[in-house]
């Protein structure tokens, strides 16, 4: 098994050759380590990445044989968003995946992350075409500012919409594209401090925790609307999403 950090789908901003090849090269950077672990060797393009960062790979005797003998048997990855490669924009990698130019065709979260369920289907197909191994989505979710109503309920329909759309995209990848998907786990079950921004206000969970960004609060836990929705999704094995 190989688990990589969050992986974004990458689209070229235009059909300009520099955007197209730039997106391609940006993608290869993201997939370098999985290429090694699934193909059992360092790809030809790895040296150009090493040169870019001034890195010298030291291989011990027998390392190449070990890589070749023990390839990974499935790929686990996190998916939150897609990005656009624009030759005129900065393109970076963060805890949430690859990040580039904004996509005018997609809505975003309060933190500017594109919401793209179809992008997950795209990535599933891309990875299976590349590795021909089963896939496992181990993180998928949206950070949002949740509001507690006077009666204590949290109506996070936006989170339900996000998860529903992505689960439907997985179903299409399985049923229409015949991609073997082993499983899916959302991020996350309970609110915790965001690893990306250090904020408690950026909530991913289906269970609300009464704590603010300064650590103040009762720590009381409350089930959000998404909790009951996902409970039903589990009971029906994903057959009933509405």
Segments and roles (model prediction):
Residues 3-242:
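Active-site region of glycoside hydrolase catalytic domains
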